[in-house]
């Protein structure tokens, strides 16, 4: 694509680690093991994902940019043919009127040679919690259960009003979620996204989720700039292990 057009197939932001984390999540893998320890060195899935990601960057398949503003510019400026990200990025796409009808939603590519690999992952989103300090736990739990936990009418109301989409599967069957979206060529993007969400592998978000992303992302940038893979991954492992002791 880049050789023929000067454009990139995908774009990715160098400091956030979103793309690499989604690759890992699509395989049901993590940079922290079940015992809560740093798990980068010796993690076969992590090493495959990192090597693949580096190859995509070095071969001009993925444009690796330095910050979020540059990332958005590659999307709105038409420098990349596609992006891998969460549903929330659709708002950025839809701000570019001249690209109306040129985009559609599909599954992400699968990581080769990993038995647990899928075409599905998640990035971002929000969660609701009832804390131990709540004055009326039963009332709070009932509220969440009767709205976010079970009401398709509730989701039908907040989608057009606030653009809030749910991964609550029954919501995806409603008329509102199945409305064609003109920007995406008439594709019912919200019901499509909800259906995709049902296939995402289980993924435990540890307290060191963002620290692990930061360490691995630094390793990727170092590898792209010439640091041997083994050295970069060992540094990421050691740095993450140290952060876990702070």
Walk through the language-model features, giving the residues of each.
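Alpha-to-beta junction loops
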Residues: 4-7, 77-86, 101
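Short helix-initiation/N-cap motifs at beta->coil->alpha
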Residues: 63-77
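Extracytoplasmic/periplasmic solute-binding protein
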Residues: 1-39, 45-46, 80
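Short, well-structured alpha-helical segments that form the helix of a local strand-helix-strand
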Residues: 1, 229-242
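Bilobed periplasmic-binding protein-like "clamshell/Venus-flytrap" ligand-binding domains
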Residues: 2-14, 150-162, 242-246
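C-terminal lobe and pocket-closing loops
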Residues: 89-100, 112-214
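Pocket-flanking alpha-helical
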Residues: 1-7, 73, 90-96, 241
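Glycine-centered hinge/linker elements that transmit conformational signals in sensory
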Residues: 1-2, 35-65, 108
